[in-house]
Amino acid sequence: MNKKYLPSALILYLNYFIHGVGCSILGQAVIKEALAASWGVEAMAITAISAALGLGRLIALPFAGPLSDKLGRRISTAIGSGSYAIYLIGLALAFNAGTNGGYQIAYVCAIVGGIANSFLDTGIYQAVSEIIYKAPGVATMGIKFFIAIAQMMLPFVLGATVATTVAGLTSYNMLFYICGIAYIVLLVLVMIFPLPDADQKAAGKKEGLIDSLKHTHFSIESVAMILIGFTCTGTFQLWLNCAQNFAKENVGWANPSIMQTYYSAGTMIALVVTALLTRKIKDVRFILIYPVICLVTLIVVLTGKSEALMLAGAFIIGWAGAGGLLQIATSVCNMLFPKIKGTVTALVMIASSLCNYTILTAASKMQPAQVMVMNIVLTAIGVLLGLFVNIRYAKMVEQAEAEN
């Protein structure tokens, strides 16, 4: 790696550090209560704002990648940073708006935040892989680490940024403003600091997703892998956005925000341990083992109802649910479906975004215990899909080798 790109790499990673706050802040019980009080809605209704992030990502997925290839990583990252600033500052303004359209403003801003996520993904994942070209796996793992570190620190940062409005409502606007302004600063830095000039010509000639779908034959196994992108995302997103509400209402825990730290610790440790385990255990085994662990954990948490179990559950779901399972699923797709790996991987990510929107929208209309049951059902479906793929694994490997 050229040392002149070290500051650039740090700037790119810091985008995901703040993203770690932005993508999980609406799942914090204290944030939900503050926003709900300001907007005159139920706390669980705030989950629909989180769902809008998934909708925005879903909207941007078809064109964010091609635009990144055409305009370059710098412009794609700048669009992502600017859009994220709109989302975060928009949340602060929406809080101030109260019942005068605050909820609607936040929903629109969250869609913009989801679009930002897509542009950050297409710009930064490629850019850091081009900077740390000798170890692209380590480069992308760094993104997950920066997200997890931010999420681990979030409960403590919330306590430091709390304020009280004239109306007597608890406000976390300072945090929204700080993160939004930080994204504006990062946008400027991204435009100033050097980035490697990757050859985009070949990428520009790649077949688009729509054209690829027209003549791609999908086997039942490839459909199962796409659906796993939906189920595994649902497992950790429902936990991330709704588990603290379950802890407050069903366990009686007054302030469960520390669960976020345990969740993030599980994710961080999983990134390292899973990377080591995949050297000895086939990747495909994890798309069964990890959902089984999540399923058992969710059942125990639902039936046990204790603070200790909530903390243990947060750590385990962070490990087995959010610690790279989606990335493992895409890796398995690349190996098992060599001729359509780009198409299948894209559809796995679309399924993931679709889950963010549909499942969280549904959760916003439920009670926390009902959300936990829905998560159990969704995870159980993921277990069945993982079992099917593992049973068919040997046959699929033979087919993949024949295609090569």
PLM regions and their residue ranges:
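Extracytoplasmic gate region of multi-pass secondary transporters
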Residues: G27-Q28, F218-M268
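Helix-to-loop junctions at the C-terminal end of transmembrane segments
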Residues: A60-R73, A270-D283
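C-terminal ends and interior cores of transmembrane alpha-helices
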Residues: G82-N100, I293-K305
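Cytoplasmic helix-loop-helix junction between adjacent transmembrane helices
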Residues: C109-F146
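Helix-loop-helix hairpin linking two adjacent transmembrane segments in secondary transporters
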Residues: A139-L195
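Symmetry-related core transmembrane helices of the 12-TM Major Facilitator Superfamily/SLC fold
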Residues: N173-M191, V371-N390
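C-terminal transmembrane helical hairpin of 12-TM major facilitator-type secondary transporters
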Residues: K282-A329
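A late C-terminal transmembrane helix in Major Facilitator Superfamily
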Residues: N334-P368
